[in-house]
Amino acid sequence: MTILTARPEAITFDPQQSALIVVDMQNAYATPGGYLDLAGFDVSTTRPVIANIQTAVTAARAAGMLIIWFQNGWDEQYVEAGGPGSPNFHKSNALKTMRKQPQLQGKLLAKGSWDYQLVDELVPQPGDIVLPKPRYSGFFNTPLDSILRSRGIRHLVFTGIATNVCVESTLRDGFFLEYFGVVLEDATHQAGPEFAQKAALFNIETFFGWVSDVETFCDALSPTSFARIA
């Protein structure tokens, strides 16, 4: 067991019965020329987030945590995105951007596209799990819940983009399914103004989970920390 200093209070977890979740670290969300950038969102400050996720993944893997990578998107025909009868059709900024700029059709969040790919710096390793997801929450229409329960995993540590959309949505759904969710705030990035990040973190630490940071997380997983607890 290890103790992670967090807000609003410390939380105890067993790394080998926990998972690090990397949410949607795709070119779409973290790279100039990707969907978020083309839709008018600022992605200029995502590089430190990528580096922090690399650090967190390395520490988590060394501690025996399961690493789960999400990729958000749909088939090339966008059948999985839903048609006019789906609220996703009307609210997805990727779909709206493509309707405004038809030349982008088939390029944004389409499986197999550059936009859909994980950023070059983040490469899943053997033993990691990569899951596609068609909506903001990683629990919707995916085997995530089954994967976690079959391994006895109850604690989830979240990183990725966007804090206020897919990260928060997945953590909230996990809360409703009795999972303990922690966000590493400096390994996440919002879609929108800075206040969106602050609001999401406030919601999480006040109502749905815990908030920590990468350095604290890595320190908690270090052998010396385990020795102190033992």
From Swiss-Prot:
Q: Which InterPro entries match?
A: Isochorismatase-like_dom, Isochorismatase-like_hydrls, Isochorismatase-like_sf, RutB
Q: Which GO terms describe its biological process?
A: nitrogen utilization; uracil catabolic process
Q: What is its EC number?
A: 3.5.1.110
Q: Quote the catalytic residue positions.
A: 24, 133, 166
Question: Catalytic activity, per the record?
Answer: (Z)-3-ureidoacrylate + H2O + H(+) = (Z)-3-aminoacrylate + NH4(+) + CO2; (Z)-3-ureidoacrylate + H2O = (Z)-3-aminoacrylate + carbamate + H(+); (Z)-2-methylureidoacrylate + H2O + H(+) = (Z)-2-methylaminoacrylate + NH4(+) + CO2
What causes induction of this gene? Up-regulated by the nitrogen regulatory protein C (NtrC also called GlnG) and repressed by RutR.
- From what superkingdom does this record's organism come? Bacteria
GO MF annotation, one: hydrolase activity, acting on carbon-nitrogen (but not peptide) bonds, in linear amides
Q: What keywords does the record list, in alphabetical order?
A: Hydrolase
Q: What does this protein do?
A: Hydrolyzes ureidoacrylate to form aminoacrylate and carbamate. The carbamate hydrolyzes spontaneously, thereby releasing one of the nitrogen atoms of the pyrimidine ring as ammonia and one of its carbon atoms as CO2.
The protein's matches in NCBIfam families, at most eight in alphabetical order, are given as: RutB (TIGR03614)
Q: Which family does it belong to?
A: Belongs to the isochorismatase family. RutB subfamily.
For this entry, the protein name equals: Ureidoacrylate amidohydrolase RutB
Species this protein is from: Escherichia coli O17:K52:H18 (strain UMN026 / ExPEC)
